[in-house]
C-alpha cells in the first residue's frame, strides 16, 4: 500500500515538475492520455472550480506542432464566447529559455458530441434544435472575427450534462486577411474527410469561404439526427460519390469552377443522379430542420447560408433573436504576423512565452519593461507531496481551499460586442446555459434546487422513455430566468446568454449525476421501472452505430452516456419552440474529453 502511494505521489510530482503555478491546483485524476501528453481533472484551490489541465509534452520538438499550439492558444484568448471552450490560464514556466512543456488550464467539460451521439438513440427534436443553435451561434462569432475553424467534427465539440456545447481544437483554424494569399488557397488542409466540404475534397475553389464550416455543421447535424455519419467516405472519390448520391450531381456551372482537373473530369463523367428527398433520408426529423439542413449542405458554397442567416431561419423562430447574438471585432493582422515569417524553435518559444504572460498581467508588465528578462520560480513538488499525503490520510475527503480573491486574471478581449438590450423588453429564458449540476448527490440525499438555492429530498426517478435494460437516467436541468434585463448585455467573461423567448417561468427538472456504481444503478433501475410512463415519448432515431474510426486520443473508452429527453412542461403550454428552450440532458459514466492542441 505504501509503495502504491509513493508511486502515485511520484506520478503527480512528475506531472507538474517545477511550474510555480502548480501550488494553485489540486489534482483529482487523470482523464486522458495521448501522444501529446496527459489531461488531468483538478480543483482550483483559489476559486473551488473544477478544471481540466492539459500537459503538452515537448512542445518544440517539431516546429509544425509548436506553431499549431501557438495558433490555438492565441485564438482561444481572442475568441471569448459561451459556445467556445475557454482557456482559464496557462501555467508560468520556470524559465523562459529552457521550458519544453506547457500546462493549459481549461474549463472542465464532461463529454463531447461524438460520445453523446454514439451512446444515445433517443435524442428529441428539442435536443436537435438546441444543439444546432449553439453550433451556429459559435460559428457566427468566429466568422465575424474572420476566423475559419476548418476542422469541425463531433469530437471537437465538447458537451456538458445540461446540453451545453462548446467548440474546441482550433489548431487548424486560420484568420482570413483580404490582402494575403492564405485566403486564396491553403495547401495544408488535412481536416477529417467525413466533414470536409466538397470544394475541399479536390481543392475545388480558388478562394475558400466560411461556407466550409457551414458544410461541416450540416454534416454534424445530420449525424445528430440519425446517430451515424452522413458521408463516411473511404477516399476522396468515395466521398464525392456519397455526397452526390444524396444531393445529386452538381450543376454544370458548379463543376466548371472545380480547381482540380481530375475531380472536374470525374464529376463531368459521372452518371446523372437526382436529389434524394431529405424527408426520405431523415423520416423522423422536423420538416423545418430538414429545410435548413438542405441549405447547409448545398453543393455549391455560394448557395449555403452564413451562420447569421442560418440563425434567422424559421427553425429557430422562437428560440432567440439573431440581432442579439454576439459578434466579434475582426482580429488584427498583427496578432498573426508570425504566419508570414519562417520561424525557428527559439522564435516560437518566445511567442508562446509571450502568450503565457497574457494570463499573468503583472509579470507581463514587468517582462515588457525589462525587455524579456526570464523569471525563475521555486518548485511546487513539496507542496504537492503534502497535498497528496493529506488526501491519502483522510481518504480523499478534504474540501478545496477557496481564498476570497484570485491573484491573477487573464487578459482576453475586454468585451464582446452585441446590440443593446431594451430595458423594457420581455423577460428572457436562459437558452444556452443552466446552472451546473452537482457531480453526485450529497450525503444527506438532497440536491440543490436551481430556482431558490433550497434543497429537497431525492424522489424515485421517473421511467426513462425508450429505456434500455440496465440503463438508468435521471431527469434534466433547469433553465433560469433573468428578470433584470439591464444586466443582460453580453459579457465575454460569463457563460450565460439571455434571449427573449418565454414569459417568466421557473422550471425545476431536478438533474443530478448518479455515482458510477453498479449497485446504485441497479437500485435506480428497479425504481425507474416501477414508475408510470410519461406522456411525452421522444422520437426514436436510427440506433445503428458505425465502427468507431480514428479514435480521439483525448477520449478514453467508457460506458454509455445516457440522456433523458423528458420535458417537464407540456408542449401545449409553450408550443414546440418553448419546449425547445427547456430541453436538456443528463449524462452518466462520463469519460475523458479532448481540448484540442493535439
Curated annotation (Swiss-Prot):
Its EC number is 2.7.11.24. The active site is at 151 (proton acceptor). The modification Phosphotyrosine is found at residue 189. PANTHER family: MITOGEN-ACTIVATED PROTEIN KINASE. It comes from Arabidopsis thaliana. It catalyses: L-seryl-[protein] + ATP = O-phospho-L-seryl-[protein] + ADP + H(+); L-threonyl-[protein] + ATP = O-phospho-L-threonyl-[protein] + ADP + H(+). The modification Phosphothreonine is found at residues 187, 192. CDD domains: STKc_TDY_MAPK. Residues 25-316 form the Protein kinase domain. Residues 414-425 have a biased composition (Low complexity). The TXY motif contains the threonine and tyrosine residues whose phosphorylation activates the MAP kinases. A motif (TXY) lies at residues 187-189. The gene is MPK19. This is Mitogen-activated protein kinase 19. Belongs to the protein kinase superfamily. CMGC Ser/Thr protein kinase family. MAP kinase subfamily. Keywords: ATP-binding, Kinase, Nucleotide-binding, Phosphoprotein, Serine/threonine-protein kinase, Transferase.
